[in-house]
Amino acid sequence: MMRLILGTAALGALAAPALAQDAIDVTLGVLNDRSGVYADLSGEGSVIAARMAVEDFDAEAKGLNVEILSADHQNKPDVGSNIARQWYDQEGVDAILDVPTSSVALAVADITAEKGGVLLDSGAGSTELTRGQCHPTTVHWTYDTAALAKGTGKAITEAGGETWFFLTADYAFGHSLEEETTKVVEEAGGEVLGEVRHPFPATDFSSFLLQAQGSGADVIGLANAGGDTVSAIKQASEFGITQAGQSLAALLFFITDVHALGAQTAQGLQLTSAFYWDQDDAAREWSARFEERHGSKPTMVHAGVYSATMQYLAAVEAIGSTEGEAVVAQMKAAPFDDPLFGEGYVRADGRVIHDMYLFEVKSPEESSGEWDLYEQKATIAGEDAFLPMIDECDFSRG
């Protein structure tokens, strides 16, 4: 476990007593995959993003004494749960950030509600965080499986990909992504021919890809992420699947995945994202600073950690407290204009509503540099991208 203190400095004998009396101690825990298939899309980059948010918020000058912890949940719910309990019970953590891997995130959401903390989830995709397992202490940033499906799934089906076969990671996120994309495909007039589920994480996709190939579907939908998606695409190319006429749909695809594959292999793939480093001046400026520290451009998960941390600290400052439900209620009190996500708001169920974007990976000829990888094809309004709120999760009712 790593610990970083970004707190109040000694300001002299006269200033220090007043500062000590007024300062609010805030402990943030960045909980994610630091060594496995999701390490590139979250990992240390999310710690850096949280640190940048604390610095850019100027927390010290505003009387917030912020400490950042980080740990590797290894994509295992039991490991993530144990860390979360230890953080809340022994380390005084006020909010847990990032938490990719939906099975881990759902477990941590329950513990957070029990302990009165805040979960600012930027990494997980399951819609259950704001539906079946919603809590007044959960805020779901960045994306979810419904938004991914409404972007990539709809675009590919309407472009002629009428029949689908899913290759799905066998855990909560994969199941949710397959389910939401199936709905969108069928609503658009397409048909799902079948699915096969692979262990999470996996390295050998040969038998699963052969089943998908044998289905004869127009589109093989990859309902997985990170290293699993990269490996599946590489192996599909080796088997000649796309060369034979079937298309791949990478339903959750990150800039780090495209970079790992290279434009030659990934060109033409469509993807849905909440953020791209080159989308506007503000994104470019922040991403350049991030790259100086991390050595790569940020993913939308990294951007989400930064944005969520900024909004959380603003809420703590506004109410002068780190009490979980009170902070989240303050975050829901008014819309925000975020430098990375634009205009948005935290809905009563904890779902953050902001625009999503459909991108297509550029060809090597179209790309002007190492990270010049996306061309924007469409904007999906936040109100259309995410599922409507269900009554059971409307925490504005008290």
Residue spans for each PLM region:
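N-terminal signal peptide c-region/cleavage motif recognized by signal peptidases
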Residues: A15-P17
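Extracytosolic ligand-binding ectodomains
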Residues: L4-T8, A20-G398
